[in-house]
Amino acid sequence: MLRIAVPNKGMLSEPAWNMLAEAGYRLRTNPRQLVVQDPDNGIELFYLRPLDIAVYVGRGAIDVGITGQDLLKNSGTAALEHMPLGFGASTFRFAAPNESPITTLEDVQGKRVATTFDKLVHDYLVEHGIQAETIHLDGAVESSVQLGVADLIADVVSTGTTLRNAGLRVFAEPLMHSEACLIRSPRLNEQDPRLAVLTRRLQGVLTAHQYVLMDYDIPISKVAAAVAVTPGFESPTISPLHDKQWNAVRVMVPKAKVNQLMDDLYEVGARGIIVTALQASRM
């Protein structure tokens, strides 16, 4: 069976579970379960600490896992990113107290930086020629400045609310942009059919989240103009109607552009425009 690691807690956990459920996989029913076998789908799910997933995958103990790109980079393991998953977007930023004179990357020189991602931060500073002390903390790094342990912090920022509440402000360019991703062991062949099935299923969920099905009627004389507005993946499905002067069109369109596309189609001459949500797909 394909061994898959998923976060047992944290901001990536629930979206990861939901995505796997939408892809047809069985999840745990008891929060104390650490392992779930799904023989019908040929997988075994392991619920692990988010920080540890890349380590297990990199060492080949687990075949694939869902984690953050920042966690993968910080792990320094041999695990390979296989595909982005479209959730858990964040940036990794430096932050200093509001009243601090630290406002640029150069100001970090000689300072103390508290972070949970010490390898990521150390490598970034070395790359930019900055010498600073990195202090590893397992969490709540915002308190380190107030307690006098550090001069600034480096941490994941989603909304910035936690930093603002702690009297901190971000500065300099982000160290990196991150989102959830599927990673694989270097021991797992990229062409492994089990991985191919998982990839198709997850991509199908992503497509269902990002696209909708649009149906509309259009005069035959306006079909070309309408298709130019909604070209679809390969090509729209065009069917004749009882009224020989009209065709029915069915096409997939980006969910984020639905209202603009409906307006554009109406201007072209389309009528009876209907949008339907997708549950799953294989493209």
From Swiss-Prot:
Q: Which GO terms describe its molecular function?
A: ATP binding; ATP phosphoribosyltransferase activity; magnesium ion binding
Activity regulation description: Feedback inhibited by histidine.
Required co-factor(s) are: Mg(2+)
Name the catalysed reactions: 1-(5-phospho-beta-D-ribosyl)-ATP + diphosphate = 5-phospho-alpha-D-ribose 1-diphosphate + ATP
Task: Report the PROSITE patterns cross-referenced here.
Answer: ATP_P_PHORIBOSYLTR (PS01316)
Q: Name one Pfam family in it.
A: HisG_C
State the function annotated in the UniProt record.
Answer: Catalyzes the condensation of ATP and 5-phosphoribose 1-diphosphate to form N'-(5'-phosphoribosyl)-ATP (PR-ATP). Has a crucial role in the pathway because the rate of histidine biosynthesis seems to be controlled primarily by regulation of HisG enzymatic activity.
Family annotation (NCBIfam families): hisG, HisG_C-term
In its UniProt entry, what is this protein called? ATP phosphoribosyltransferase
This chain's source organism reads: Bifidobacterium longum (strain DJO10A)
